[in-house]
């Protein structure tokens, strides 16, 4: 689910959102830029020299941080993005390695002219955050990990396989409930949103 990028060829621009639905187009929270040919959706809230970057997990998107955005933005500039292959970002992906994603995140920050960040990563996003720290230590001012991947050899392959292969809301719900101690939190709206993402063009191949 990651992109192989040339760090010497980065173009920054806001792309008109002509292909999104009306709700997306009219939502000022969402911005779009281009990182070496890949369309990226992101949010940029708050102000100041202290910048927080939020990295979501596998199968998620920047809206996983919806209830954190405004609270963090009260005291920090707060960035979140749809990682390659996720959300409304591009689905053409060439490098599925952690190193490839760390490079992508670094290039994304270069596009926004952000030299350093406090990184918070969840699940896969945590593993990417740690890789970013290893490869670009000058970029990471602090590291916050939430249920991070990469801290041990265990990988829940049944969950990953089930998420990728689920074709219906019923199948997907059985998988997503594994993420919650209280299974009732896997709401119908959550399942429908995830299924809509999974059925989007290019997602199956990206995952």
What are the roles of these predicted feature ranges?
Residues 40, 154, 163-207:
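Conserved alpha/beta-hydrolase catalytic His-Asp/Glu region
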Residues 77, 111-154:
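Conserved hydrolase catalytic core segment
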Residues 66, 106, 130-134:
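Short, hydrophobic alpha-helix immediately C-terminal to the catalytic nucleophile
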Residues 87-88, 149-156, 183:
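A short beta-to-alpha transition loop/helix N-cap that caps and shapes the active-site region
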Residues 64-66, 89-95, 154-157:
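Conserved catalytic-core motifs of eukaryotic protein kinase domains, centered on the activation segment
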Residues 1-52, 73-76, 114-115, 145, ...:
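Alpha/beta-hydrolase fold catalytic core
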Residues 38-88:
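Conserved HGGG/HGGXW glycine-rich cap/lid loop of the alpha/beta-hydrolase fold
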Residues 29-31, 35-43, 79-124:
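Active-site loop/oxyanion-hole signature of alpha/beta-hydrolase fold enzymes
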């Amino acid at each position: 689910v990651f992109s192989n990028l040339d760090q010497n060829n980065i173009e920054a621009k806001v792309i008109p959102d002509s292909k999104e639905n009306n709700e997306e187009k009219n939502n000022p929270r969402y911005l779009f830029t281009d990182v070496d040919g890949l369309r990226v959706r992101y949010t940029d809230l708050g102000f100041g020299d202290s910048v927080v970057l939020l990295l979501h997990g596998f199968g998620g998107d920047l809206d996983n941080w919806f209830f954190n955005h405004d609270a963090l933005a009260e005291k920090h500039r707060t960035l979140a993005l749809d990682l390659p292959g996720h959300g409304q970002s591009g689905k053409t992906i060439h490098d599925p390695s952690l190193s490839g994603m760390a490079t992508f995140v670094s290039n994304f920050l270069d596009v926004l002219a952000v030299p350093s960040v406090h990184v918070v990563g969840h699940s896969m996003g945590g593993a990417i955050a740690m890789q970013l720290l290893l490869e670009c230590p000058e970029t990471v001012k602090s590291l916050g990990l939430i249920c991070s991947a990469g801290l041990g050899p265990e990988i829940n392959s049944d969950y990953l396989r089930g998420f990728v292969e689920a074709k219906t809301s019923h199948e997907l719900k059985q998988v997503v409930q594994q993420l919650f101690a209280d299974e009732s939190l896997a709401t119908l709206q959550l399942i429908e949103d995830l299924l809509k993402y999974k059925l989007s063009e290019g997602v199956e191949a990206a995952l």
